[in-house]
From Swiss-Prot:
It is found in: Cytoplasm; Nucleus. Its main location: cytoplasm. Involved in homologous recombination where it functions at an early stage of recombination in a pre-recombinogenic complex with rlp1 and sws1. Also has a role at a later stage of recombination in association with the rhp55-rhp57 complex. One of its GO terms (cellular component) is nucleus. This is DNA repair protein rdl1. It comes from Schizosaccharomyces pombe (strain 972 / ATCC 24843) (Fission yeast). It comes from the Eukaryota. Coiled coil: none annotated. One of its GO terms (biological process) is recombinational repair. Keywords: Cytoplasm, Nucleus.
Length: 230
């Protein structure tokens, strides 16, 4: 389970597009859950789009139904590798919380989060989702939305920090492996991210060594994002 927290607008979604463009060849099928109605097919290459099933889910129940459908697909094709991208996990959960029953919304969120994480352990599945950044006035700092319990569902959490001159710094603020504190600099060119030197392998969930830039293991599913995912 990988979370990307945006600094503004659709910055986290640009990160999800970049991840798919970089690693789509590792997956047989991709499900993109669009909770905002902003999916941009022009951001992905045609071979990636051909593998992608787009699901529009604007509320929490629709999000759950999409994950249930993915689980059914995984059970019927256990030999295939899947990627799940959720373009704004915090949006449907926030709408559910706004209805007033905070306890129910929190339980719903944690149940769905744990289910996604369990699926990454049982099947060849990598999960990438974006969330919003909220400002905590009392602490004078910003942090990912969804509260203090949600990080227990994650393997890696990244925060995007806006830099000057069309630069964006991706900082790992939570990791079950050895990514904590690692940063990746991206350049924003023509509405999409690119990089000069890759320091984080977002597929294996590991730092990229100088001598093995995105080395692919002979066994594809040795990856920590598949079967033992990040």
């Amino acid at each position: 389970m990988n979370q990307v927290t945006q600094f503004s607008g659709n910055s986290a979604n640009l990160m999800l597009y970049w991840i798919l463009k970089s690693y789509y060849s590792r997956f047989d099928r991709i499900m993109w859950i669009d909770t905002l109605g902003t999916f941009n097919p022009a951001a992905l290459p045609l071979p990636c789009l051909e593998k992608t099933m787009l699901v529009r889910s604007f509320d929490a129940q629709g999000l759950k139904d999409a994950v249930d459908e993915l689980e059914s697909n995984l059970k019927s094709s256990e030999d295939q590798a899947y990627a799940l991208c959720i373009d704004s996990f915090s949006n449907p959960i926030g709408l559910l919380m706004a209805q007033g029953n905070i306890s129910f919304a929190h339980a719903f969120m944690m149940t769905l989060g744990r289910k996604c994480r369990i699926l990454t352990r049982k099947f060849r599945l990598a999960v990438y989702l974006s969330t919003s950044l909220v400002y905590i006035k009392q602490l004078h700092l910003s942090k990912p939305a969804l509260g203090n319990s949600w990080p227990f569902c994650l393997d890696h959490s990244y925060i995007l920090e806006d830099q000057q001159h069309n630069k964006c710094l991706v900082h790992c603020n939570q990791s079950r492996k050895d990514l904590l504190g690692c940063s990746q600099l991206f350049l924003l060119l023509k509405g999409s991210f690119t990089h000069e030197y890759l320091t984080i392998d977002f597929y294996n969930g590991t730092p990229v060594s100088v001598s093995s830039k995105l080395h692919v293991s002979p066994s594809l599913y040795h990856s920590s994002t598949l079967n033992s995912p990040s």
